[in-house]
């Protein structure tokens, strides 16, 4: 058990020359408790070419975080691995976890896993290549994990303490979310200096803990449920090559590529419409849900009535008040008006490819380290201030140089719609493919140049060496779009990435 208590009780000040004084006093006490009990048992057996290791255990914990809330976990686990002649490896694990976050009959989940490996470089047929192939290992695994990361007491229906009304509906059937993952990979080292690691994985999350949208007729927040399946597939490649070429010069190059794609396979009550995002079966989580467009409306799309008002021609569908220079939205469902039903799924935030590279050079007492990082194939959409007209009133934004490329009768191929004092003009602020941009980028994350002083004079005064360096963080970014940082894609109200030197 662990208890903590603290008091803040006195603070005072006085002004000696004015013969006045003031005092503040108060008291504050906090209490938390944590109970833990655990035990493990191990067994190791080795004989000739055989090696067996096994471990089993149990642990239980109870936590109180300073109020009436309490939660507890208990776990049983066992693991064993066997190695034969340093060539063949197999390992199995099983655990049974229980959580107080779930109701009776649903507290416990069982999560097994198994893994196997083959050190091919230890085989007799690899001996002729021993000097060239230092390591060659194949490995594969399959296992499951549980997720109980939800709020407390979600399995219970709660009532208002004053009038007895039910205020929160619980779900007594809520239980563990389970992740099933298969992966296969290889580790290779050639000529002692070149290392390659490749891994492919297929991860399936079932019984997802989700909260459905609020019912239109219920009038109360929905209870969490187990419903939904999401699959993540991807691969990772890691390369490393380093060598001390001469006594004075050495280098190391480390790089990697990775790709992950997720897709919703099952979802209760789908789709979940979240405005400009949507969760729909067959698409990535939180895919963009935007209005399709066809450039900007032109004067040729309208005629004028006797009052001088712009009237759209037959086949041209607009929002009320739109005129030449505004975004031309497409009536996708053909009902003769632009509504939220015209939106469609257009991409997601998950990149097509992630990559990085780290280059280190050493020459005598000099050292240089450069780190690159980037992504390709990322969908993003501009929002305020870029899609909100000038919007210079109140806490609006300063006009941008890029907004000079706005629509006029003489500049019909402009990047921006017609000038407008705020977002209410022309309905141009809706998230649409007109505001789409490719957020691919390559960034130099850091550059560091250093020099080591280690002359004998320093050692006489007890100093082994002095390392002096110049460092720059985020000095360069290469991207197609320049209006916003392509990595965090923050626009109004977000703090930009900082360059430091």
What are these regions (language model features)?
Residues 254, 341, 351-365, 445-450:
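Conserved SET/PR-domain catalytic core that frames the SAM/AdoMet-binding pocket
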Residues 346-381:
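Glycine-rich, aromatic-lined ligand/substrate-binding cores of catalytic
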Residues 225, 242-349, 389, 406-411, ...:
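Conserved small-residue
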Residues 1-6, 17-290, 431-501:
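Extracellular/periplasmic, surface-exposed regions of secreted and cell-surface proteins
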Residues 375-467:
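Extracytoplasmic gating/loop element in the C-terminal half of outer-membrane beta-barrel translocons
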Residues 19-22, 335-340, 424-433:
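Short glycine/proline-rich turn/loop motifs
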